[in-house]
């Protein structure tokens, strides 16, 4: 039997409580997780360690979520981004989705909805690797 490596998710959020809660939740669902306290910290690591999916806050000091999306393209355009924000607006939603986000969720995030969104976003990557969430 071949054991497949779990997909790697990057959690990028400046709020430590949210970052830790998301990390614990997706880890318990079987994903590998790297957490980043800022968009700049994530961008410094992405070239060396590309995740299978990014859970991205929009409103962070310094390098915000929109900046991260823009900086990821084109080198990492194939990495799905799911925006998780506490500041919902139709303008932000449209901007994130037009920037390539595969999902847009508002805090507080429902766990089942988050997992469904992640599964849909990484379906192509995990099908190739043969991984399924436990």
Region roles according to the model:
Residues 67, 88-103:
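Alpha4 helix (beta4-alpha4-beta5 surface) of REC/receiver domains from two-component response regulators
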Residues 60:
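Receiver (REC) domain active-site loop signature in two-component systems and cognate sites
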Residues 16-34:
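Two-component/phosphorelay signaling modules centered on CheY-like receiver
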Residues 37-38, 64-68:
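Acidic catalytic/metal-coordinating carboxylates
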Residues 49-55:
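Active-site beta3 strand of CheY-like receiver
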Residues 91, 109-119:
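C-terminal output helix
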């Amino acid at each position: 039997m071949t054991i497949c490596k779990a997909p790697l998710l990057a959690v990028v959020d400046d709020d430590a409580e949210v970052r830790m809660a998301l990390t614990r939740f997706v880890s318990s669902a079987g994903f590998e997780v790297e957490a980043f306290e800022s968009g700049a910290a994530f961008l410094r690591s992405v070239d060396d360690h590309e995740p299978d999916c990014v859970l991205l806050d929009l409103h962070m000091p310094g390098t915000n979520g929109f900046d991260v999306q823009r900086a990821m393209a084109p080198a990492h355009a194939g990495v799905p981004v799911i925006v998780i924000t506490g500041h919902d607006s139709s303008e932000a939603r449209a901007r994130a989705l037009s920037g390539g986000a595969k999902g847009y969720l508002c805090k507080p995030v429902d766990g089942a909805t988050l997992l469904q969104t992640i599964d849909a976003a990484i379906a192509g990557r995990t099908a190739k690797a043969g991984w399924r969430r436990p």
